[in-house]
UniProtKB/Swiss-Prot annotation:
Chain segments carrying region Disordered: 1-36, 58-184, 224-333, 385-547, 784-821
Domain of life: Eukaryota
Keywords: ANK repeat, Coiled coil, Phosphoprotein, Repeat
Any GO BP: negative regulation of actin filament polymerization
Disulfide bond sites: none
Ranges of compositional bias, category Low complexity: 77-88, 151-181, 388-400, 494-507
Descriptive protein name: KN motif and ankyrin repeat domain-containing protein 3
Job description of the protein: May be involved in the control of cytoskeleton formation by regulating actin polymerization.
PROSITE patterns, alphabetized: ANK_REP_REGION, ANK_REPEAT
């Protein structure tokens, strides 16, 4: 007995179930055919499938000869229009068996309400339900062949009255074994049938659109017919043939596309697709006839004009989508670059600081240039006024007596004179003109001290000598030295190197009785009185009649108002710059004279003590005050005037960390008694043991390193600490031992409390430093002092050395300057 083999290469038919639940009583519906419905509405006969299986089995599975069996005609297939449900494609028919012995074997299946999935274009997958149905059918056929008798030649095998679809093949017929080419042909035919079904579905979807167009054209036709009676303009009659020709071409193109679609589809006349296509074709023919009948109407041309832009708009809308996608992809790369630059944020910080410094420098240069322009204008006006005043003065001097100038001066004291002198400070005395001309106009000098170590073993020079500076004027460096400096000096005067930051000391005055001291007389310099016989009296009159120029007075008044306001209130920078510029021009130049400074101080004192304290302690960009400059340039007469105000901050340090007291320890005096009196007064008013903010040196160490023996004695007399140490732990004795200052070493050893055994930060003593510097005499003196405990150094002291004794050269408790013996 031949077995029914299932071909696994058959495509999946897509049916979810083939055996629906039978009707009540186990009977099938008489209208159910022996077929399977595909998702596209195509019915496949199971007999055809069994025939394909028999062809695959070949001649080895041929049945025994017997009478052919007759087949009962199948029920007609329903049309394609009724094969689909409204919602989705479903299988409306299934297989059932008419065997009475097993009525419910094939009734176990899925519920009949499941929806069919559309056919997927991917590779076919085996359907277990179809395989189960085929195996069940094969088994029943084998059972039927074993139990049935051979039928007569003239009769056919009776079939089930229900038409269950079971049929037995003719046993006497031996079909020829098909080849692989025939099987491939069958598969291609089935695939072509499925493709045809898809095309029919696509054409069926276009039918509603065509019907909508037909309705729109009919409405347009009705509108055109309604407007035929209206008179047409003359312009439309000329363009009528062109619009009619355009409308005909559009109609022909639409009809051609529809006919081509019908030719490809070729639906049957009895199918719904065929009927709809026929209706569409008829509607188009009617439309062509109606359009032909309206050749003379202008409204037909408007239909053609409205139909063209629809297609163009569809194409224009598709273009921007691709461009927008490209635009959105561009910023991603830019953001990645911005993220990479975040790792380099450390580099722009230095560049930004440099830019800030450059901006500040530019602002400063602009301010200086503005001040210079204003000063130039003032000088030009003052020159013209001075020439006029000089001409008038010469005419008056020819006719007046010797008492006339002083009477004029007394009269000018009561009434302000409109004439202006070249300086911003004015005086009615005849000598004021010459004094102002002696002061050269210049900008604010910004200078710091340039440190240069002295040569070991060099002896201090006896000639006058001032410090060397590195000044910063208008953004450039310039070096300046005193005119009294001698080339034979081995020592170089220094201050401190310019630091990156600034530090200022506290204005700590030693007492409030500075006015009780006897200030040194101001040096007249180049200022000469034109009448020597009346020298004393005009000088006293000039001191009582000091006035400021109107412009400087206004600036001082504005500055006084700012000082009285709270700190949070905005200040006027122009007034501050003007006052500072004039103050440093008068008091801080190398050739500045004491008389103009005294006149300006008197004029500022009249406006208020608070303004006087502010002006006296004004500092430039390097932290230097007028006291720093006067001491550094050796203008101790000006320094005495500043100390007389009682508001001068003696201990204030500049940006290099040095105070005016430390600079005074390096200054050489010109007039021995007068200048030394000012220096001693400065030492007594300040803190002689104050240390520089950078190196920690004291004024005593600076004086020793520069060979100022007289300043060393004065500092010791004012209470300088001999054992004070700097930042490296060095003392004044170590400094003197290193430079070979033998006289200074003797002077230091005579001071009570001097400890030569002190060690610095490296554990080195003064004796070791002297031996290392090859200072044999100093080393022998230190060794003798350490060996004997208290050697007699008085007999070995040179005649020029000074020894401080109790009660001589010491400062008083009230801060008065000592008297030099």
């Amino acid at each position: 007995m031949a077995k029914f083999a299932l071909n696994q290469n058959l495509p999946d038919l897509g049916g979810p179930r083939l055996c629906p639940v039978p009707a009540a009583g186990g009977a099938r519906s008489p209208s159910s055919p022996y077929s399977v419905e595909t998702p596209y509405g195509f019915h496949l006969d199971l007999d055809f499938l069994k025939y394909i299986e028999e062809l695959e089995r070949g001649p080895a599975a041929r049945r025994a000869p017997g009478p052919p069996t007759s087949r009962r005609p199948r029920a007609p297939r329903p049309g394609l229009a009724g094969a689909r449900s409204p919602g989705a494609w479903t299988s409306s028919e299934s297989l059932a068996s008419d065997d009475g012995g097993a009525p419910g074997i094939l009734s176990q299946g899925a519920p009949s309400g499941l929806l069919m999935q559309p056919l997927s274009p991917r590779a076919p997958v085996r359907n277990p339900r179809v395989e189960h149905t085929l195996r069940e059918t094969s088994r029943r056929l084998e059972l039927a062949q074993t139990h049935e008798r051979a039928p007569s030649p003239g009769r056919g095998v009776p079939r089930s009255p229900r038409g269950s679809g079971r049929s037995s093949p003719a046993p006497n017929l031996a079909p020829a074994s098909p080849g692989p080419a025939q099987l491939q042909l069958v598969r291609e035919q089935m695939a072509a049938a499925l493709r045809r079904l898809r095309e029919l579905e696509d054409q069926a979807r276009t039918l509603p659109e065509l019907q909508e167009q037909v309705r729109a054209l009919r409405a347009e036709k009705a509108r055109l017919l309604a407007g035929r009676a209206q008179p047409e303009p003359d312009g439309e009659a000329e363009t009528r043939p062109d619009k009619l020709a355009q409308l005909r071409r559009l109609t022909e193109r639409l009809a051609t596309s529809e006919r081509g679609g019908r030719a490809r589809a070729s639906p049957r006349a009895d199918s719904p697709d065929g009927l709809a296509a026929g209706r569409s074709e008829g509607a188009l023919q009617v439309l062509d006839g109606e359009v032909g009948s309206l050749d003379g109407t202008p409204q037909t041309r408007e239909v053609a004009a409205e139909a063209v832009p629809e297609t163009r708009e569809a194409g224009a809308q598709a273009v921007p989508e691709t461009r927008e996608a490209g635009v959105e992809a561009a910023p991603e790369t830019v953001e990645a670059d911005a993220w990479v630059t975040e790792a380099l944020l450390g580099l722009p910080a230095a560049a930004e600081r440099e830019l800030e410094l450059l901006r500040a420098s530019l602002e400063h240069q602009r301010g200086v240039s503005e001040l210079l322009r204003g000063r130039l204008r003032e000088l030009e006006e003052a020159r013209e006024a001075a020439e006029e005043a000089a001409a008038g003065a010469r005419a008056q001097l020819r006719e007046a007596t010797t008492q006339t100038p002083w009477s004029c001066a007394e009269k000018a004291a009561q009434t302000e004179s409109p004439a202006e002198a070249p300086s911003l400070t004015q005086e009615s005395s005849p000598g004021s003109m010459d004094g102002d001309r002696a002061v050269a106009p210049a900008g604010i000098l910004k200078s710091i001290m340039k440190k240069r170590d002295g040569t070991p073993g060099a002896q201090p020079s006896s000639g006058p000598k001032s410090l060397q500076f590195v000044g910063v004027l208008n953004g450039e460096y310039e070096s300046s030295s005193s005119e009294d400096a001698s080339d034979s000096d081995g020592d170089s005067e220094n201050g401190g190197a310019e630091p990156p930051g600034s530090s200022s000391g506290s204005g700590d005055d030693s007492g409030g009785g500075s006015d009780s001291g006897t200030p040194g007389p101001p040096s007249g310099g180049d200022i000469r009185d034109p009448e020597p016989e009346a020298e004393a009296e005009p000088q006293q009159v000039a001191q009582g009649r000091c006035e400021l120029s109107p412009r400087l007075r206004e600036a001082c008044v504005a500055l006084q108002r700012q000082l009285s306001r709270p700190r949070g209130v905005a200040s006027d920078g122009g007034a501050v710059r003007l006052v500072a510029q004039e103050w440093f021009r008068v008091s801080s130049q190398r050739r500045s004279q004491a008389e103009p400074v005294a006149r300006m101080l008197e004029g500022v004192r009249r406006l208020g003590p608070e303004l006087l304290a502010h002006v006296v302690n004004l500092a430039d960009g390097n932290g230097n005050t007028a006291l720093h400059y006067s001491v550094s340039h050796g203008n101790l007469a000006i320094a005495s005037l500043l100390l007389d105000t009682g508001a001068c901050e003696v201990n204030r340090q500049n940006r290099a960390g040095y105070s005016a007291l430390m600079l005074a320890a390096l200054t050489s005096v010109r007039q021995e008694e007068e200048d030394m009196a000012v220096v001693q007064r400065l030492f007594c008013m300040g803190d002689v043991n104050a240390k520089a903010s950078q190196t920690g040196q004291t004024a005593l160490m600076l004086a020793i390193s520069h060979g100022r023996q007289d300043m060393v004695a004065t500092l010791l007399a004012c209470g300088a600490d001999v054992n004070a140490q700097d930042a490296d732990g060095a003392t004044a004795l170590m400094c003197a031992s290193e430079y070979g200052r033998l006289d200074t070493v003797r002077l230091l050893l005579t001071q009570p409390g001097c400890d030569p055994a002190i060690l610095d930060n490296e554990g080195t003593s003064a004796l070791a430093i002297a031996l290392e510097a090859e200072q044999d005499e100093v080393a022998a003196l230190l060794h003798a002092h350490l060996s004997s405990g208290q050697p007699d150094t008085q007999s070995e002291s040179p005649p020029g050395s000074q020894t401080a004794t109790p009660g001589e050269g010491e400062c008083g408790d009230n801060g008065e300057n000592p008297q030099v013996q």
